[in-house]
């Protein structure tokens, strides 16, 4: 799919600009997004968080630009987990440079995680899920409320696997997710949050100082519903690194 999309001028320009922004950072990747998108890389490269999160955001932004080149723009936007970065871009809350920088430092920071974590999708609402979690002494948390009957849980691998066995015995739908040992939106991410916030703040300051980002480069603003603070109207000028720190560690309130 990527090799086909890259043939479109608007999509390719978005990918190449993202690569250019990342190459300007003091802490930069040793790979290029365009190589990942076109398959010019090792097959398992996309499984690394710093690559998968960065490339996923770049592709999402490329699709936003592609649709915009056809005069197709959203009237409102919502994002899920790291998908909020591209959602903020599409809704005019972030520039392209701010968005790809946010994604890169998120992925790069979580590679420092040393805890063994897992995530579990379950076919129940958060209230019912909490009843099961009460027996696990804080080792598992609700990571995402996806719909009234779909919740994602996250935490210590041993506890998550045990819960999966319990749910299976009770006939409750559950599925372990492939996250490369990461327990996103759980206590595993809390120790990484401050480092992510500090590094991202420096990165955003850098791209602004070198002229790669200013507010005039944002899309016209449309409604964006935050899945961190779904009942708040966010001020784009206050959408700083602290927000993305919360996005990494807090539950996704998608529903």
Each language-model region and where it sits:
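Short, surface-exposed "cap/lid" segments of acyl-processing enzymes
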Residues: 1-13, 17-18
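Acyltransferase
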Residues: 17, 23-29, 36-255
